[in-house]
């Protein structure tokens, strides 16, 4: 199991990817403790001096001008958590909640939120005991932060709400007991500090990023397999072509194809002097299209790594100056736009894959048997598998519509512009599943096409990719129940089996 000492503000994408995939044991860097204590002391000083400061002794949103009496401050913190836990729909996965909790811990531990160490440690203990609050997926507009999801997360700290432990749903009170904790009475500012922030949106977006990385790798491998199966030319991957255009990601994508389609391929050698001048765009323009997708992935990764290490609370406590300042770091517009760009990349990866698969089943273009099966007519082969791929590609086109351009005012127009980051990021999982399904169909089709080129072999990496599939799915010699083949190919892609065939340091979370 991964052991991770949190150095606040220094989480890497590689670490975040690991936490998104498996349980973790967290600890807090002792050097972070003084800053946490100092910010909490500033809040205590505000209360002792009787000053009025938003989020500490006032109402929230439109009620920000309502001062709360000292005897009601503890009730205020509990009330904000319980009243804001108003999400709806299916529950987030344990993986998403674990990542969200890590992001919240990382943000609070930077020492700008005025929250006590014991609250942060309680979140750490829940994660370490693999106790994950039950958090509905829907109910956040991404400003003022992810209020509803983070409120559901926080109810467990109060001994309220529900959590999941070993696959079973238990009460928040029982969850705290299992973690060896007593329910927490939140001090002034702490309820708001827990609820304000972009951690739900960012967790969804990071998961989408990691899915996009895996899809990019698999699509590149499947695309190279399709080049071989269709007897496509290698000349479009010549580094000189991409160097004169100048896009770094296009050059990197072309390098990946050359890495896969090396000169040892017998299939490539067999038609090196053929008369065919140009391949269809779905083969020839792969570096250009996939390079553009890689640019979106890298750009989103840069934004999300910053956001994962950010302080998105409000108000913020600057202990060195004794100041508490209201701002808008909770507005998740950067996350929303990054997620929108990832959606474009995921959709285009799938769209290009579907076109390559359609090319392979077209005997006029690929010079392979119609629908990749012998005895056509009696056998329909990959005919309807391509229809499935087309349906998934079309669905992704609708899902790729930008969410960040939408906004609905909330909280009686006090919060009059919102980011919709949570939906922007949440839909990436569905889009990823669609694109993975398309790639599964292409993977099957490309391997089938390569088998028809026997006894000629491709390059070692392409042959390894083909063999990985053939260990699970045999050659399609005649019509059989097709769905299990797609499911098996899909399962392999979900395991990211192609990542090891790609060049190192290509994708952001590899660094």
Swiss-Prot record:
It catalyses: L-histidine = trans-urocanate + NH4(+). Gene3D superfamilies: Fumarase/aspartase (Central domain), Fumarase/aspartase (N-terminal domain). Pathway: Amino-acid degradation; L-histidine degradation into L-glutamate; N-formimidoyl-L-glutamate from L-histidine: step 1/3. Its EC number is 4.3.1.3. CDD domains: PAL-HAL. It comes from the Bacteria. The modification 2,3-didehydroalanine (Ser) is found at residue 144. GO terms for cellular component: cytoplasm. It is found in: Cytoplasm. Keywords: Cytoplasm, Histidine metabolism, Lyase. One of its GO terms (molecular function) is histidine ammonia-lyase activity. GO terms for biological process: L-histidine catabolic process; L-histidine catabolic process to glutamate and formamide; L-histidine catabolic process to glutamate and formate. Contains an active site 4-methylidene-imidazol-5-one (MIO), which is formed autocatalytically by cyclization and dehydration of residues Ala-Ser-Gly. It is an enzyme of class 4 (lyase). There is a cross-link at residues 143-145 (5-imidazolinone (Ala-Gly)). Belongs to the PAL/histidase family. This is Histidine ammonia-lyase. It comes from Vibrio cholerae serotype O1 (strain ATCC 39315 / El Tor Inaba N16961). The lineage of its organism: Bacteria, Pseudomonadati, Pseudomonadota, Gammaproteobacteria, Vibrionales. The gene is hutH.
